[in-house]
Amino acid sequence: MELNELRPAVGATKDRKRIGRGPGSGHGKTATKGHKGQKARSGGSVKPGFEGGQMPMQRRLPKRGFTPLTRKEYALVNVGQLEVFEAGSCIDVEALLNAGLIGGVKDGLKVLADGDLTKPLTVKAHKFSAKAKEKIAAAGGTVEEISL
């Protein structure tokens, strides 16, 4: 048997539905579109969100908020995630990328305080939450804020 001789098992495939090809196909004449009406016409379908002239949901709901142009998007790491590193190691953006803890850095790296840290580590990041600094110091580590 060759690769070009492989065929699906008998009964495993169905013939495709040939629409509008005469009465014998079972889908002739109206071609599964029913009788008349907008959806039976060529190009005839309502656009997404159209509710028959009623004010659509998207326009009934209020607009809310905005995104500041100066918004910074930090890569986030929690203190508990730093447990994977060996005691005494220096942790920076490169080390976190290699460990797969962050996907990439846009506007910097921020360390947050979720989880517990038991090892003394040197952590270099652009920002730290106050509690994250406390937890790193309590574990005997040091915090270094690097500029962008």
UniProtKB/Swiss-Prot annotation:
Q: Which UniProt keywords apply?
A: Ribonucleoprotein, Ribosomal protein, RNA-binding, rRNA-binding
Q: Name one GO cellular component term.
A: cytosolic large ribosomal subunit
Q: Compositional bias (Basic residues) at which positions?
A: 30-39
Q: Give the record's GO biological process terms.
A: translation
Annotated segments matching region Disordered: 1-61
GO terms for MF: rRNA binding; structural constituent of ribosome
- By its UniProt entry, which SUPFAM superfamilies does this protein fall under? Ribosomal proteins L15p and L18e (SSF52080)
**A Pfam family of this chain:** Ribosomal_L27A
Q: Which InterPro entries match?
A: Ribosomal_uL15, Ribosomal_uL15/eL18, Ribosomal_uL15/eL18_sf, Ribosomal_uL15_bac-type, Ribosomal_uL15_CS
User: What's the subunit arrangement here?
Assistant: Part of the 50S ribosomal subunit.
Q: What family is reported?
A: Belongs to the universal ribosomal protein uL15 family.
Function description: Binds to the 23S rRNA.
Q: What is this protein called?
A: Large ribosomal subunit protein uL15
UniProt source species: Geobacter sulfurreducens (strain ATCC 51573 / DSM 12127 / PCA)
Annotated gene: rplO
